[in-house]
Every structure is written in C-alpha cells, then in structure tokens.
Amino acid sequence: MQFRHEVKHKISNLDMLILRQRLGAVMAPDCHAPNGEYEVRSLYFDNLEDKALREKLDGVYVREKYRIRLYNNDPSVIHLERKFKRGALGHKDSALLTPEQARRIAGGDVRWMAESANSVILGFYSRICSEGLAAKAIVDYTRKAFVFGPGNVRVTLDSHIRTALRSTDFLNPHCATVPVPDSPCIHDPEGL
C-alpha cells in the first residue's frame, strides 16, 4: 500500500489567487484539467451517528471513508473510492462503477455488491452491512491542480464548495446544492 502525505489548509481567496500564479510558474497543470480547472462531485457515505465525519473533525489518527466520485458531471467514468488515512498519510483505492451501479448504491440497493470480484466494492458492501453506511451528502467544488514530477508532488486548490445534505441525486447535473457558509479555499499539497 503506497501512501501520500496529505495536508489541507484553509486559505483566503486572495491567497488562492497568489498561489495559482506562483504554482503555475513552477509546476505543470494536472493532466486531468485540460482547461486548467475541473469540477468534482462526491457522494459521501456515513452511518446514522456520522462516524466518518466525526472521526475527521476529531482528527482520529486511523480512519477510512467511502465516496462515489465523478468529474465534470461526466457519468462515463464514475469511481467508488475508499480513502484510508493514517495521520497525515493517505491512501486511496478505487473501483469503476456504471451509472446504474452508482444509482443503485445511492438508493440503498446493494445486494448485488456481494457478488462482485472487486475488493473495494466488497469492502464497501461489508461496511454497509456491518455499520449501516448510507448516502449522506453530495459535495461539489471546483479544483485547480498542479503537479511536479520530482517527488511526486501534487497541489490542489479547491473553491466554490457546495453541498446537498440528505440528497442521493448524485448523477443529476441539476441537483440543487447550496454554497457552504464561509466556504474557504482549500490548499492541499500532496507528495510522497
């Protein structure tokens, strides 16, 4: 299992503009962002007690979460992701989903997952059954990403953060989301 250092910082809009300029001078744009930015939509899963959210807010040293993610509202590539954190180190495993599989999971129709040969899907199914994980929130944001080959460094700047609580309409590009109050920009430098 290969881990990356992940550190997140809340920054102001002014700091984001300055960082975009400075990073653009020394780092390459992420290959997934041909026009410089891309949209991220994630559907997060948690139990009735919001265990994953509470562990993140409390800074629990070892934790994991599951989400379904797509980019630029393009349903042709949808990922089920398991994100595992050990302190500031993070590791991500993913499995491709069809739009129909994503809809079924979001709606709570998960029995089919027990027959999957994919370890991420099986692990998620196990957590759904043992902990009662269910779709909890949609989070949308705009990401500007930079990469630097030596050291495997990746820096992302996230802005325009929006959410839809208790919504599972993940694949609807017109799903109603609201801005997160006092939404900061997130500066997330990652590296090996």
State where each predicted segment sits:
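Phosphate-end processing signature that detects enzymes handling 5′-triphosphorylated RNA
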Residues: 1-192
